[in-house]
Amino acid sequence: ELDEAKAVMTRVKANLPVSESKLDSLSPEFQVQIREMQALMKREAADSKGTCKDLPKGKPEEWLPEIVAEHKGRIVFVDFWATWCGPCRTGMKEMESVKDSLKEKGVDFVYITDTSSDSNDWLAYVARHEGIHYIVPEDKKQAMQIPNYENAIPHYLIYDRKGKFVKAISGWPGVEKMMQELAAVQ
């Protein structure tokens, strides 16, 4: 039951829904703790810049196309990263300085990490970085069929307004280079 409670608590911390039947399956002690955490997370979510979302239903190879399709009509910047990755954190921090101007030009930011990231650290990043945030089971990441991905992060993908893959960038190239790549997309 402890593993189930931990899994539920991870969803609560990510501000993701938990079914009543799932809560009811836990002991009363866990239910009280989880409901208290839900109330706390609801209050904190109001201050968060980012939004956590569940992965789309279906197979891992369907996740990325479905995520991108949700942003049709906008340029999509996908950032594969982890909390323990220094260059990933640097890239996220440096992109904050240009994010508002990019959003005005129609760029949406999607962040995808995996379960190798510490969940508390991940939630802290979600709170500070506006965009849509997903967490993928580490063993499913390869099955996502990420374009030009060679198991190294940071890894960035750019999609055009029609949802067509345009470019993959491995490693943090700096804000100026990233701005050039995004400006080239219509």
Residue ranges and their predicted role:
Residues F80-S97:
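Conserved redox-active cysteine motifs that mediate thiol-disulfide chemistry
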Residues V78, V110-I112, L157:
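Conserved hydrophobic packing residues within short motifs/helices of P-loop NTPase cores
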Residues R74-V76, F80-W84, A152:
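Short pre-active-site segment immediately N-terminal to redox-active cysteine/selenocysteine motifs
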